[in-house]
Amino acid sequence: IDTGMSDTEIAGKYHHPGSVQPEGYAVYEQLENLGIKCSEVTDIIFTHLHWDHVYYLDRFVNADLHVQRTEYQFAVNPIPLYYKSYEYPVLGLKPQFDGRSFKLYDGEAEIFDGISVYPTPGHSVGHQTVVVNTSEGQYHCCGDLIFTYDNLKPVPEMHYDITPPGRFLDIVDEWNSIVELKKRAKSQEFILPTHAPEMIEIVDSKRVYGN
């Protein structure tokens, strides 16, 4: 699910100065630690196609790629405000997904037995959450729908049932998608946001979720 960000040099030069990918944390390095070669990966499901979720695709030469149709259509022809997010060629960059074919989905779908997706737009036009069934329960890999678990908390004094993140494309979609995520997930433990600080501990622990 997703392939992560670029190296530190590209991230700092073209995207967010100060962004760092620690040595050993690139997706291909993490897979190598698990004894998996990128060429052995058969499928990649993307929550969305922002630059920090699609890097190193050139290493996954045998993988089928899965994404929502609306996300793909916007990624290849974004408005100027999102040129950087999708590394649009006019900036002198080549999108990681350039020249690759995708299997496109229109809404909720089962991709494999025990692995499904449902739309969670808001952070991007066609953002989706990936659900993986395990012996422990269904884990919701929600990409950038939330950035921290605090986004799931209500704010009673403001009558908010969530605390939405500050970065979004459409706040109405974002709000409704987070509410939907909370409704579907068994508990917070079963929600895995890409950028939550706790994810580093999860990666370092090399935990395997269920079976």
What annotation goes with each model-predicted range?
Residues 1-29, 129-143:
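Conserved beta-strand hairpin/beta-sheet module of binuclear metal-dependent hydrolase folds
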Residues 3-6, 49, 70-71, 123-124, ...:
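Active-site metal-binding loops of divalent metal-dependent hydrolases
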Residues 10-13, 18, 148-166, 208-211:
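Active-site gating loops and adjacent loop-to-helix segments of metal-dependent hydrolytic enzymes
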Residues 22-36, 40-52, 64, 69-119, ...:
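Metallo-beta-lactamase
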Residues 58-61:
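Short, conserved loop/helix-junction motifs that constitute active-site signature segments
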Residues 76-83, 90-92, 97, 152-153, ...:
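C-terminal/domain-terminus segments
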Residues 111, 131-133, 138-139, 149, ...:
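Divalent-metal (often Zn2+) His-rich catalytic cores of metallo-beta-lactamase-fold enzymes
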